[in-house]
Structure formats: structure tokens, C-alpha cells
């Protein structure tokens, strides 16, 4: 059995590849830049293939002979300037293209996100579950939520009348050890802030989960869990200043926990290339929570402790940066 992993060089995808290899499972790691395969150890079980979600011929070749697909490919929202072109289209059109060549696939695990569950306009303190959908997103208001929700819908519609096992995994923000310096971007940029960012934090709440739990969930879901189920993976929620205090307590050195007030936060957003007042206004001082139900139990996950996740993530960041 060979498992195709799309987005194999991404943070989640790379950990999925490593988890499969650790179990002696043959992996076909799909990536656009094969030079990034250097992050993986040499192994007779690892086959590296160059393919692109917009190139159907390359996808067809990548899928050929694989009955199991773990679809992790995604675009980093934090670096995108053209949300439609760089985030929405790769997620939706890329998923449609992949579906078009998976005639012989029997099991697919699709990496979604809590972004596909959390509405753009949510109530402060709202608890969301796998029954919720991000149905109010647009490219301008919530491009990432739109991309994740619509890609999942496309995948589910494609699988609806097929004899195929489909499970979608919905992690919150993913923290944990890096496997390559490029993993310091994306979700880990929140913790990167504490390692080399300014001496203040914004009043933002972060829901997070360990990348190792997420990777194991993807692999275990090939066998475990209910077909067509959406599994939310979320461990803990903390305000940024709480994370700073926790790191200071654990690591034996000072990490920033000074919180900016709203006027200063909006000024920072105005000047920061990756922030906007619109995006900040939607999240500043607000939070949601997630009901993971029996996801960790059913998928038999280690359930890493919050302190372990934060410590391992920051130690790894400091090694790579």
C-alpha cells in the first residue's frame, strides 16, 4: 500500500509523511518544489513526485496506483496578496482537479480547518461543533474560511455517490516542532512573534492543537473513525498575553506579555503588511471555542498537553530561526 500525500512539504503534510514512514508505510510525497524533499530522511519507503494542483496531467500521474490519498495541500494565508488567486482558487479548483483523477482511490483524508466551521460573523464566546459551517464568507471578508469551506463541500459532493471512504480533519491553529524553516510561517507565525517579534502582543485569542496529534489523526483516520465524519481537532484556547506568560514560566526567560490597547492595536494594523483594521476588528478581544466531541478518543490520539506543545514549538523555532 502506498499513500499519496499532497502538500507533503507543508507543516501538517510533512508531519503526516513522517508519521507514515515511522509506521513502515510507503509514501508518495507530492510537492511542487522537489528540493524541499531534503526535510525528509532517505528511505526506500519514500517516493517524491513533482505535481501541481493546477496541472491535471501531473495529478493523474501522482495518484496512479494509490488507493489512499491524504490531501493536505493548502496555501499560506498570511503571505497572500491576491486572496482569490493565491488562497481561494488553489483550495477549490485544486480540490476539484484532484477529484477528477481519483477514480481508483478508495480512502481519502481531507485536511480542512476550523475555518470551514467558524462563521465570519460569530458570537463572542460561541461554542462551535462539526455541525456548523462557515457559510457567510466572501473573498473580501474571510477568504481563508471561504476557501476551506468550499473545498470541503466540493470534496463531499464528489464523494457523495461513490464507494469511497472520506473523512475531513478540522484542526484549529497548529503548533509544534518544525521539520523545516519554512514551517515557521503560517500558523507558527503566532509563536514566532514571541521569538523574534516586537515587545508587545495584540488582544487576540488563539485556539490551537499539536501538529503531532493532527498528523496521527490523518493516518489513523484511514482505518479509524466514521465514514463522512468531520473531526475537529482542538486542544486549548489562550490569549496572546497568556501564551507569553506561560512561556516565561516554562522556559526560564522573559517572553513578552504586554498587551496593546485597541487604539494602538489599530495603528499597528494600519502599518503592518500582514494585518488590516478590518481583519483585526473582527477578532480583537473576541473568542470562540470548539466542541471536539469524541475525536481524540475515536482517532486514538496521544492528546499532547498544552505546555508540551508550546514548549516543543518554541524550542524548535529558536533552533531554526
Residue ranges of predicted features:
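Glycine/proline-rich active-site loop of Rossmann-fold NAD(P)-dependent oxidoreductases
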Residues: 161-164, 176-188, 221-231
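A conserved pocket-lining segment of Rossmann-fold NAD(P)-dependent short-chain dehydrogenase/reductase
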Residues: 80-81, 135-140, 180-181, 187-209, ...
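Active-site Tyr-X1-5-Lys
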Residues: 138-166
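Conserved C-terminal active-site "lid" loop/helix of NAD(P)H-dependent oxidoreductases
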Residues: 269-302
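NAD(P)H-binding glycine-rich loop region in Rossmannoid oxidoreductase-like domains
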Residues: 34-36, 41-93
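N-terminal Rossmann NAD(P)H-binding glycine-rich loop of SDR-like oxidoreductase domains
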Residues: 3-25
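Conserved Rossmann-fold NAD(P)-dependent oxidoreductase catalytic core, especially the SDR/UDP-sugar
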Residues: 81-142
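Mid/C-terminal beta-alpha module of Rossmann-like enzyme folds, strongest
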Residues: 217-277, 307-321
Amino acid at each position: 500500500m502506498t499513500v499519496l500525500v499532497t502538500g507533503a512539504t507543508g507543516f501538517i503534510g510533512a508531519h503526516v509523511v513522517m508519521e507514515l514512514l515511522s509506521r513502515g508505510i510507503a509514501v508518495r510525497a507530492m510537492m511542487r518544489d522537489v528540493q524541499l524533499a531534503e526535510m525528509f530522511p532517505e528511505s526506500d519507503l519514500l517516493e517524491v513526485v513533482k505535481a501541481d494542483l493546477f496541472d491535471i496531467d501531473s495529478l493523474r500521474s501522482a495518484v496512479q496506483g494509490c488507493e489512499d490519498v491524504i490531501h493536505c495541500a493548502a496555501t499560506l494565508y498570511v503571505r497572500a496578496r491576491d486572496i482569490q488567486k493565491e488562497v481561494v482558487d488553489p483550495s477549490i479548483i485544486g480540490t476539484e482537479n484532484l477529484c477528477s483523477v481519483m477514480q481508483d482511490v478508495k480512502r481519502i483524508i481531507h485536511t480542512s480547518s476550523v475555518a470551514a466551521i467558524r462563521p465570519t460573523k460569530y458570537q463572542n464566546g460561541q461554542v462551535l461543533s462539526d455541525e456548523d459551517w462557515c457559510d457567510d464568507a466572501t473573498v473580501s471578508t474571510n477568504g481563508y474560511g471561504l476557501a476551506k469551506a468550499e473545498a470541503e463541500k466540493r470534496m463531499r459532493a464528489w464523494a457523495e455517490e461513490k464507494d469511497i471512504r472520506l473523512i475531513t480533519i478540522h484542526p484549529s491553529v497548529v503548533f509544534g516542532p518544525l521539520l523545516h524553516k519554512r514551517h515557521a510561517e503560517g500558523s507558527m507565525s503566532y509563536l514566532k512573534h514571541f521569538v523574534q517579534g516586537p515587545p508587545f502582543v495584540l488582544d487576540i485569542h488563539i485556539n490551537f492543537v499539536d501538529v503531532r496529534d493532527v498528523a496521527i489523526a490523518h493516518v489513523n483516520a484511514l482505518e479509524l473513525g466514521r465514514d463522512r465524519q468531520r473531526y475537529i481537532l482542538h486542544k486549548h484556547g489562550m490569549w496572546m498575553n497568556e501564551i507569553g506568560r506561560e512561556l516565561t514560566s516554562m522556559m526560564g526567560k522573559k517572553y513578552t506579555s504586554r498587551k496593546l490597547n485597541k487604539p494602538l492595536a489599530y495603528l499597528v494594523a494600519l502599518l503592518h503588511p500582514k494585518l488590516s483594521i478590518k481583519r483585526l476588528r473582527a477578532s480583537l478581544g473576541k473568542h470562540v471555542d470548539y466542541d471536539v466531541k469524541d475525536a481524540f478518543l475515536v482517532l486514538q490520539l496521544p492528546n499532547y498537553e498544552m505546555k508540551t506543545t508550546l514548549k516543543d514549538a518554541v524550542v524548535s523555532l529558536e533552533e531554526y530561526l
